[in-house]
Amino acid sequence: MSARQEFASHHATFNHVWSSLLLEELFRLGVRDIALASGSRSAPLTMAAAAHPGFRRHLHFDERGLGFMALGLAKGSGRPVAVIMTSGTAVANLWPAVAEAQLTGVPLIILSADRPPELIDNGANQAIDQQGIFGRYPVYQQNLPSPTATIPAAFVLSSVDQALAQQARTPGPVHFNCMYPEPLYPGDAYLDFSAYLAPLGDWLRSSEPWSPWQLTQAPCPCQPDWDELQGKRGLIVAGRIQDPVQAKAVAALAERLGWPLLADLQSQLRFDGRNLVHADLALQHSGFVAELARAEVLLQFGARLISKRLGQFIKQQPWQAYWLIDPQPARLDPDYRLRRRLLCDPAAFAAAHPVAHPHLPWHRLAERQQAVSQQVRSACERFSELGVCHRLNQLIRGQLFVGNSMPARLMDMLGEAGKGPSRVMTNRGASGIDGLIATAYGFAQSVQPGSNEPTTLLLGDLSALHDLNSLALLGKSSRPLVVILLNNDGGSIFRMLPVPTQDALLETYYCLPHGLHFEHAAAMFGLHYRTPASLADFERDYTTALEKGVTLIEIKVPSSEVAEDLKALGSAIRGS
């Protein structure tokens, strides 16, 4: 809202006054995107969102997908995204997205409509107890009472200011539960609320928030033992870092220190030439492990590593010092090995900890990795899940969103140094296989307006079945979007785990083969469809799909192939 456009004084009901106040204050605090699902109890919020000229509105018919779409938007833009839905189980459907947002520090703002208190727990339709429905996961939650003239308008504005200030300090989801009595829709005439709004004074004509909280960013202090630490044999591990600019500071620090860099897929450094690109697989090679174990200290930037082998190596080493640098105020220490936790951005840490002069590398890990890299290339020469993921790592252009289970692991293991994607995003907080299509769509829409940058989603068949109705979102994409679907007919990751195989236990209760293909799903939702039969076909189909529209590329492979290929590759590495 511009400074010249005064806040409206005429509204249908008090419900609409409060909804307009709430959304206007969110806008003044920087919110620009709102995700909405249809519903009657949420009509005041929906009408306020539709009337506001400053919001981008994103619609979906399924609240579970809606929450994940908002999650992707917030992850991609780095800005809070509001989500509006009606009462009842519609709210409960947001639980998975709220959990992921809390675990990864993503700023969602949940605006749930609710029945008034007198219609809760008395048999009224579509009414459940929504207060505290998300448990301890919101970083701020408030049950807004039914709108009334006895509660000042400044209460609504001040509540929003407090919530977003808390969210800025501790990134994660915020929940406002809005208890609206009927009427929910406008009558024949709007009412004049000038007297009620008058105490807001200049706010009505301003573009500034009511009472913004002034947050100060404490500088990252230089650690007193830094000079001693940088003289040791060190290792730098890069975990989840969402900002490529922050990630570059980590790579530059590793290079100047002469320390090896092991970069997770989520670090934005996976394709950097300074990264030991096949370190996960090389941890099966005794010579590589012995050389890496000479490291005395560990600096880790970002948490939630995909590689289990790397996590086990870190857990087993007798580190003289182990520091984790991550701005998220959470205990990111699953093995209780950390000895120092620094709450700051990687670039702030690097700026506060200068390296006096470049150090020569203390290790020969690149040399040790060469044989492993050759084994990887040989294993990826044919059409398979390994081959497709290895080739995708070389062809990728634009943004990349990677699903959980096998896709994340394969993309983290394979590939080569090169240009790589502009950004990599995952849902590795709760690491669920639900909502991945919707999250990727939201991530794709976070690209700067006017850009035609493509987004690629890689996921498995069970993940696709979990979120099949979110394919309806993809047809709305204004930019190229490619879905690469690895269809191995079930949960083949369980073939990598020690599940007993007798009495068909593995197949019947874990892998859950379904025998389904996705050609008709693509047709139903108006998507282009390709099913390559060779790596050359895949390269042709993928590069074409990057240019325009939305394309689903289904990779049909035998169910047991990926497990067999990885076991064979591991044996070859251990024997090399």
UniProtKB/Swiss-Prot annotation:
Organism domain of life: Bacteria
PANTHER family: 2-SUCCINYL-5-ENOLPYRUVYL-6-HYDROXY-3-CYCLOHEXENE-1-CARBOXYLATE SYNTHASE (PTHR42916), PROTEIN PHYLLO, CHLOROPLASTIC (PTHR42916:SF1)
Cofactor: Mg(2+); Mn(2+); thiamine diphosphate
Catalytic reactions on record: isochorismate + 2-oxoglutarate + H(+) = 5-enolpyruvoyl-6-hydroxy-2-succinyl-cyclohex-3-ene-1-carboxylate + CO2
EC number from the UniProt entry: 2.2.1.9
Enzymatic class: transferase
SUPFAM superfamilies assigned: DHS-like NAD/FAD-binding domain, Thiamin diphosphate-binding fold (THDP-binding)
GO-annotated molecular function: 2-succinyl-5-enolpyruvyl-6-hydroxy-3-cyclohexene-1-carboxylic-acid synthase activity; magnesium ion binding; manganese ion binding; thiamine pyrophosphate binding
Underlying gene: menD
Stated family: Belongs to the TPP enzyme family. MenD subfamily.
Any GO BP: menaquinone biosynthetic process
Keyword GTP-binding part of the UniProt annotation: no
Pathway(s) annotated for this protein in UniProt: Quinol/quinone metabolism; 1,4-dihydroxy-2-naphthoate biosynthesis; 1,4-dihydroxy-2-naphthoate from chorismate: step 2/7; Quinol/quinone metabolism; menaquinone biosynthesis
Gene3D superfamilies in the record: 3.40.50.970, TPP-binding domain (3.40.50.1220)
Reported function: Catalyzes the thiamine diphosphate-dependent decarboxylation of 2-oxoglutarate and the subsequent addition of the resulting succinic semialdehyde-thiamine pyrophosphate anion to isochorismate to yield 2-succinyl-5-enolpyruvyl-6-hydroxy-3-cyclohexene-1-carboxylate (SEPHCHC).
Pfam family, one: TPP_enzyme_M_2
Oligomeric form and interacting partners: Homodimer.
Keywords linked to the UniProt accession: Magnesium, Manganese, Menaquinone biosynthesis, Metal-binding, Thiamine pyrophosphate, Transferase
Protein name according to UniProt: 2-succinyl-5-enolpyruvyl-6-hydroxy-3-cyclohexene-1-carboxylate synthase
Cross-referenced InterPro entries: DHS-like_NAD/FAD-binding_dom, MenaQ_synth_MenD, MenD_middle, THDP-binding, Thiamin_PyroP_enz_TPP-bd_dom, TPP_enzyme_TPP-bd
CDD domains: TPP_PYR_MenD, TPP_SHCHC_synthase
Cofactor, free-text remark: Binds 1 thiamine pyrophosphate per subunit.
Signal peptide positions on this chain: none
